[in-house]
């Protein structure tokens, strides 16, 4: 007997696109753009819940814990994508934000049959990463019923983790399984059931908020500058200089000299220049300030 998906918003037909196969290219992209515009409005109704997830993630980081994103298919790929962007953007170890996709790395580029239907696989994946009560597990599923995600959330709760769920159906199974439900109703997809569209867009926006918000709360930004950016290519080398210039008002040569004196740390260079101290003292200030530049600048001379 097949699953009953008829009650899910993500599986219903969109009345605006019943004649999609008869539309011109311009009509297709116009209706898609109009439907996509509904996504931020739907997310706006979930902001308090998203903010709670940001708080929990930041608290986990402060305790030495990690943030796990779990999903299958598009949902899992989005979690892996957002997790992979954290080390170069925020200078954190790759183990700090982890994206788990049902079926493993292979599933990122091709479907792995049956993987999303296995609760046990989720438990194995979390155990392999040594899940602890200090971690936060966020389950992602547009349908809100993916067994892999449900298994991960149940195991995480047994360990004592905070758990959150991101779904695109109201009253979802994963929303009920998690401590915190982030359920966004984007309406039916332009192409019926193709949740890589509006649902995927909504998930990506929410994941951006959780990852960025929690990193900002733990000192990874000064003003709106990403002060822990890693200089892994020429563009980022220049961006690092620009960040120091924007934060301090110094000339490029002085910005580069400060970065070099700080061992490549943009955050330390900014603290040196604004607190008028050397790299060693700037590092001590930042340690005392738990990595927050604004607080480090205000500290008394050590």
Residue spans of the language-model regions?
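Glycine-rich phosphate-binding loops that contact phosphosugars or nucleotide phosphates
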Residues: 68-206, 214-218
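Cofactor-/ligand-binding subdomain signature composed of acidic, glycine-rich
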Residues: 1-42, 46
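Gly-rich Lys/Arg/Thr-decorated short loops/hinges at beta-loop-alpha junctions or inter-strand turns
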Residues: 31-39, 99-110, 222, 263
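Glycine-rich phosphate/diphosphate-binding loops that line cofactor/substrate pockets in enzymes
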Residues: 53-64, 130-132
